[in-house]
Amino acid sequence: MSTESMIRDVELAEEALAKKAGGPQGSRRCLCLSLFSFLLVAGATTLFCLLHFEVIGPQKEEFPAGPLSINPLAQGLRSSSQTSDKPVAHVVANVKAEGQLQWQSGYANALLANGVKLKDNQLVVPTDGLYLIYSQVLFRGQGCPSTNVFLTHTISRIAVSYQTKVNLLSAIKSPCQRETPEGAEAKPWYEPIYLGGVFQLEKDDRLSAEINLPDYLDFAESGQVYFGIIAL
């Protein structure tokens, strides 16, 4: 039954009761009946509107079954768990190579992946693209001599397009401000140097990370001297 039909029936009933009712008591009955009828019509109208605009009704599934119901977080974890195919390398210093900075990949926490090679103490780039290049060294000494000590760390590139070594990143530090006085205690000093930057590289470019005073390198702890690239 539609709302219009319900309203029409209530109005006809009110007219019939008004004709039969007489006196004050009948008027009160008509008033109560009219109020009840109004509330009934209002309730029916409200219910009709709620059903019409689907405010109430059958509940929809919040998580429908099927391939479209993949949880975004689960999907992200699944994607991150897949092995990346981007070139990456992280090599560390060979602590047994005295008097020189020699890189090696066959060591714990070191790797060469997806085409990167270590050849002649240089990293060889496998593909064109943007790369993050980074390196860190740690120097250690005891006391300060009469002459200044300058420590340098440099990352260089030999490109395929021009066979000339070009410095990409470089830093210099001096750990000693003045000479240790004669007879005074020679205190130890430490100087870390970190280099890092993003560069456009070409396939078969060669990268090197070098220092000027390898005798000052500190190999006391692993992970202090390293060199690497990451394709972006």
Curated annotation (Swiss-Prot):
The modification Phosphoserine is found at S2. GO terms for molecular function: cytokine activity; death receptor agonist activity; identical protein binding; protease binding; transcription cis-regulatory region binding; tumor necrosis factor receptor binding. Residues 57-232 are extracellular. Coiled coil: none annotated. Residues 87-232 form the THD domain. The chain crosses the membrane at residues 36-56. Signal peptide: none annotated. The keyword Phosphoprotein applies. The record marks S34, L35, L39, L40, C49, L50, L51, H52, G76, L77 as: Cleavage. One of its GO terms (biological process) is chronic inflammatory response to antigenic stimulus. Gene3D superfamilies: 2.60.120.40. CDD domains: TNF. PANTHER family: TUMOR NECROSIS FACTOR, TUMOR NECROSIS FACTOR FAMILY MEMBER. This is Tumor necrosis factor. The lineage of its organism: Eukaryota, Metazoa, Chordata, Craniata, Vertebrata.
